[in-house]
């Protein structure tokens, strides 16, 4: 392993909270653009009690990687709590003072992560990127202040690009 890199599995844990009491009715899915999106599923007559609850600050990913345009569906929930299909895997960062979830999401957004996930997927007809493989991902984990400064710099640049795009659209 490269110096300064750590295994992702040292920082994350799976979460399997079901919607047994049907208190959460905000149904979302996860897109290959790494965002939670409104579900297009027809849920008429569907028992939503087995759907998984995703809490704000948790992640979800679809382990099936085939037919996804070489990308993996993974996202960090920044909105209110939601439910997703039980086919997704939900997980969270165990200690947010060691690994910032926003920093981790930046790592997941890299094309290199998508390539790694596709390469490490197993299966013939239906390729799967399993939890164990996700835990084996090696990533640089600088101290938490450095992670937060990287996230802030990225967000600032992204906001400026969007502002310039809006200005250009008005010209």
Report residues per predicted region.
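Non-catalytic DNA-recognition/assembly elements of restriction-modification systems
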Residues: 1-19, 140-170
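Sequence-specific dsDNA recognition surfaces
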Residues: 4-61
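Short, positively charged
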Residues: 11, 100-135
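Glycine-rich, flexible loop/turn motifs
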Residues: 24, 40, 44-47, 70-72, ...
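A short beta-sheet element
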Residues: 56, 60-111
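"Short basic amphipathic alpha-helical interaction patches in structured regions
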Residues: 74-78, 105, 120, 152-154, ...
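A short glycine-rich beta-alpha junction/loop motif
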Residues: 82-87, 122-151, 155
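Alpha-helix capping at helix-to-loop junctions
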Residues: 93, 110-114, 126, 134, ...
């Amino acid at each position: 392993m490269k110096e300064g890199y750590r295994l992702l599995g040292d920082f994350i844990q799976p979460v399997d909270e079901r919607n047994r009491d049907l208190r959460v009715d905000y149904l979302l899915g996860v897109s290959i653009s790494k965002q939670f999106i409104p579900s297009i599923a027809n849920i008429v007559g569907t028992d939503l009690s087995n759907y998984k609850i995703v809490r704000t600050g948790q992640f979800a990913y679809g382990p099936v990687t085939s037919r996804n345009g070489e990308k993996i569906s993974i996202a960090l929930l920044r909105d209110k709590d939601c439910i997703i299909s039980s086919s997704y895997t939900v997980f969270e960062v165990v200690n947010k003072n060691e690994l910032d979830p926003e920093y981790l999401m930046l790592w997941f957004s890299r094309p290199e992560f998508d390539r790694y996930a596709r390469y490490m997927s197993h299966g013939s007809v239906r390729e799967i990127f399993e939890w164990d493989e996700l835990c084996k991902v090696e990533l640089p984990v600088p101290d938490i202040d450095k992670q937060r400064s990287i996230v802030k710099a990225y967000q600032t640049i992204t906001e400026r690009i969007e502002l310039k795009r809006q200005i250009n659209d008005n010209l």
